[in-house]
A protein has these predicted regions:
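N-terminal hydrophobic or amphipathic helices and topogenic motifs
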Residues: 1-63, 339-354
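A short, structured surface patch at a secondary-structure boundary
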Residues: 26-34, 38-139
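Extracytoplasmic substrate-binding proteins
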Residues: 61-66, 123, 127-222, 246-247, ...
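Short, structured coil segments at secondary-structure junctions
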Residues: 84, 149-152, 239-240, 301
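Flexible, glycine-rich surface segments
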Residues: 199-286
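C-terminal soluble interaction/assembly domains
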Residues: 251-342, 351-353
Length: 354
């Protein structure tokens, strides 16, 4: 923390904050250990007015407009405050973008296609004009590219937030990159999301004991699951469930042997999954068990498995920006609470039929 500076923290997010010192203001992007990964200034005047000099400042292209995105999640965090996505100039992995507004802009050639990992279209990135290029730090396609040294690259760490509301609140950081009026709209939208989330969380459970839920997937013969500080674990707690790995405080995913997981079968009431299954008509519990020889070993004794199929549910997009709807959906699945209404979106989480 810089002495004499004024810090403004978001309400729920932990990976960014604003700092003001003298006449300079900036956005600081933070790692989990509070290391500053990037210091972002809206223009050169803000940089020059900051009495606290920083190494490698990111100065937005003040004479350009709009944002370029590396992740489809970034687009979904723009849409709540920019319903027509007029500030979206280009992006990667466009085949995975799901929103109607986004696909319309793509169809009208209003958005440049940057390709996707590993075949990034550097020519399209170079041709694009934008205020900032929003990336996730572990997949920067411009790493080591000399002509991109002065490009305003901003790491977006929504995926590393330990709460659903923290993830969604990154819509404010993206809006700040555009303008004060965009930030005002993002604040208004997010306040509504947060109020609905808190209301859903405050509802009592329709049963005396909460369900114990495990989530994760089989990777290279091990079970890989979110830790207890992850947004998934927090979502389950807010839905009234108990996360089966609540004692795991380590950073990153928790890896368990399948033998250890098998021993837990009797302690787990339900298994929660995120899948990508194109054959949606035949997505059943039996089909999931058949898809991997290990799945039969880890099936809870109850036989209950619920899943979000990323083919039909925009799990990494719309639902990130609308955690209130995700919470209502999950509470409805686990406890039959309410009607699980999610606006014009189909429910994301569903029990797998036998």
């Amino acid at each position: 923390m810089q002495q004499g500076a004024v810090y403004e923290w978001p309400d729920h997010a932990e990976r960014f904050r604003w700092r003001t010192l003298n006449e300079g203001s900036c956005l600081e992007v933070l790692a989990a250990n509070d290391e500053i990964l990037a210091t972002v200034y809206r223009d050169s005047a803000a940089l020059m007015g900051d009495a606290y000099g920083v190494d490698d400042p990111v100065v937005l292209a003040e004479h350009q407009a709009g944002l370029a995105t590396l992740s489809t999640t970034h687009v979904s965090l723009m849409e709540p405050w920019d319903s027509m996505l007029v500030h979206w100039k280009g992006g990667g992995s466009l085949d995975y973008v799901r929103s109607t507004a986004a696909t319309k802009r793509i169809a009208r050639n209003k958005v440049l296609d940057f390709g996707g990992n590993p075949e990034w279209n550097h020519e399209a990135i170079l041709m694009a004009s934008f205020r900032a290029f929003c990336i996730y730090p572990f997949g920067n396609p411009l790493e080591g590219v000399t002509w991109a040294n002065d490009m305003p690259v901003v790491p977006i760490l929504e995926y590393d937030e330990p709460s659903p509301l923290g993830r969604a609140e990154w819509m404010k950081a993206l809006a700040w990159l555009v303008s004060d009026s965009a930030l005002d709209e993002a604040n208004r939208v997010f306040d509504g999301v947060a109020a609905r989330y808190v209301h859903a969380r405050a509802q009592g459970l329709p049963r005396e004991d909460s369900l114990v839920v495990l989530t994760g997937s089989v990777e290279q013969g091990l079970w890989s699951a979110p830790n207890s500080r992850s947004f998934v674990a927090q979502l389950l707690r807010d839905a009234g469930a108990r996360y089966a790995l609540s004692g795991e405080m380590r950073q990153g995913n928790v890896e368990l042997s399948l033998e250890a997981l098998y021993a837990m079968r009797g302690e787990v009431d339900a298994l929660g999954l995120v899948l990508y299954e194109p054959d949606t008509a035949n997505l059943t519990l039996a089909r999931w068990i058949e898809s991997n020889p290990h799945h039969a070993q880890i099936l809870p004794s109850s036989g209950q498995v619920f899943a979000a199929n990323a083919v039909t549910c925009d799990y990494f997009g719309w639902w990130v920006a609308h955690p209130d709807a995700m919470l209502r959906n999950l509470r409805h699945v686990l406890y039959g609470e309410g009607d699980g209404a999610t606006g014009d979106q189909s429910p994301c989480f569903k029990w797998l039929a036998p």
